[in-house]
């Protein structure tokens, strides 16, 4: 079904999350602002929770003002509620993807002159459900039911660990393969939920006037993916089906990121001004360094609506990323600039050991290598290199897509390093990043 959506729309090959942490990333998806600006620095939980500032204006709120009905189903993970307000909350088990889609049908087909915005967010393929102790190597279940059980309407797909594809940032071990088999099974439920949602749109006459954006909040829930700003954490699947585009099955090489989603959907909805930067008059104030200041509310991204049908659009050649926390105790701020040639990571708190999300630390795929010692391989790095990181990591991403050779200390690349540091500083200044002061004070 994911492939069918791509065949009827546009596949973006270079789409990126701006942080690889669930709450923070979803805050960017819905606000169009990097999380260091919207305040959602990390996870929303009942203890010491992060949440966005009260002044942040999010996509569901803006679309409601523009005359849209709004609803969400599944995983939300953002706050406060009034900032991320959806008029309708549809109940469903966020692992039961077909049930989620079915429960959305009443909202989709409701008789109304208003158009609708639906935020369909699964918990799959996040880790969860404990470990499958009955299986070799005791992999995390990734939400899969024990004993080959199935969720309502889902035909569970089972994978042979010996035959799964192992991404290069992971170690090719029995433990990794066992976990990937569970991960891919969980992902197959997402595919089936999407398929059911597509059927419901067609059945109710909404397919030909509904734009669909399909993506993941970040990369795979494995060490080297989630919580990192390596390619495994930031590079995400991204498909857009614009019902009005003539060219179908398009592959687009524009570099886009999650800050571009809100501007694009507001553009499609007609709630965007001619400058393609600031939304219409209801957006009039944005707090500045010394309190509120008058002026247009400017998003950090831009609309890609006009280039969806293109293959190699001009001036879409760089993205920026910003990660600060996962959980409250997992502080490790990183800032990133990545273009076609180079990628620079600034590990602001580099003297600290890299912190682990609890589920990633406990993962058999990580623990197996950790127990072998600091020199044990983990993907293209060692365990030691994964945990202890330098201040700067500079990669020739065009020649070294697996980020295996750090060029930051190379005399040959000294000028490149300074050039990309300057790009990061400008990005931080433009987006009012509080961590910009770390250039001066640390």
Predicted features along the sequence, with ranges:
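N-terminal catalytic scaffold of extracellular/periplasmic and nuclease hydrolases
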Residues: 2-9, 15-25, 30, 34
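Catalytic-site neighborhoods of secreted/periplasmic enzymes
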Residues: 28-118, 123-131, 138, 142, ...
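Polar, glycine-rich mid-to-C-terminal structural blocks
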Residues: 301-306, 316-319
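Anion (oxyanion) recognition and catalysis
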Residues: 6, 64, 338
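Residue-level detector of anion-binding/catalytic polar loops
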Residues: 11, 69, 343
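Short, surface-exposed beta-strand/loop micro-motifs that present aromatic residues
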Residues: 60, 104-108, 332-338, 345, ...
């Amino acid at each position: 079904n994911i492939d069918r959506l791509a065949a009827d729309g546009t596949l973006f090959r270079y789409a990126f999350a701006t942080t690889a942490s669930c709450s923070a990333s979803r805050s960017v998806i819905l606000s169009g602002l990097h999380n260091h600006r919207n305040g959602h620095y990390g996870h929303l939980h009942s203890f010491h929770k992060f949440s966005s500032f009260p002044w942040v204006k999010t996509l569901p709120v803006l679309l409601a003002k523009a005359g849209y009905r709004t609803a969400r189903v599944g995983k939300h993970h953002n706050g406060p509620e009034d900032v991320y307000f959806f008029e309708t909350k549809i109940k469903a088990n966020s692992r039961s993807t077909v049930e989620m889609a079915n429960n959305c049908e009443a909202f989709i087909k409701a008789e109304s002159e208003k158009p609708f915005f639906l935020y369909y967010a699964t918990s799959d393929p996040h880790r969860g459900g404990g470990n499958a102790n009955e299986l070799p190597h005791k992999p995390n279940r990734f939400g899969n039911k024990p004993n080959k059980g199935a969720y309502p309407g889902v035909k569970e797909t089972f994978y042979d660990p010996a035959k799964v594809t192992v991404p290069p940032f992971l170690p090719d071990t029995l433990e990794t393969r066992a976990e990937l088999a569970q991960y891919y099974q969980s992902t197959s439920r997402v595919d089936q939920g999407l398929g059911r949602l597509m059927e419901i749109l067609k059945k109710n006459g909404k397919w030909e006037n509904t734009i669909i954006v399909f993506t993941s909040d970040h990369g795979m829930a494995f060490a080297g993916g989630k919580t990192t700003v390596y390619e495994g954490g930031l590079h995400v699947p991204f498909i857009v089906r614009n019902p009005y585009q003539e060219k179908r099955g398009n592959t687009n090489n524009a570099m886009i990121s999650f800050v571009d989603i809100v501007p694009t959907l507001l553009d499609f909805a007609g709630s965007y001004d001619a400058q393609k930067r600031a939304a219409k008059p209801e957006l009039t104030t944005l707090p500045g360094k010394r309190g509120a200041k008058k002026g247009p509310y400017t998003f950090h991204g831009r609309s890609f609506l006009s280039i969806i049908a293109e293959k190699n659009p001009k001036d879409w050649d760089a993205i920026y990323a910003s990660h600060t926390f996962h959980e409250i105790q997992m502080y490790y701020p990183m800032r990133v600039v990545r273009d076609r040639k180079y990628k620079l990571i600034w590990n602001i708190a580099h003297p600290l050991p890299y912190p682990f999300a609890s589920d990633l630390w406990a993962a058999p795929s990580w623990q197996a290598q950790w127990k072998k010692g600091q020199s044990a391989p983990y993907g293209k790095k060692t365990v030691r290199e994964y945990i202890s990181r330098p201040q700067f990591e500079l990669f020739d991403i065009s020649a070294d897509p697996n980020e295996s050779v750090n060029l930051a200390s190379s005399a040959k690349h000294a000028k490149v390093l300074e050039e990309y540091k300057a790009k990061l500083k400008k990005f931080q200044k433009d987006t009012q990043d509080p961590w910009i002061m770390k250039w001066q004070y640390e």
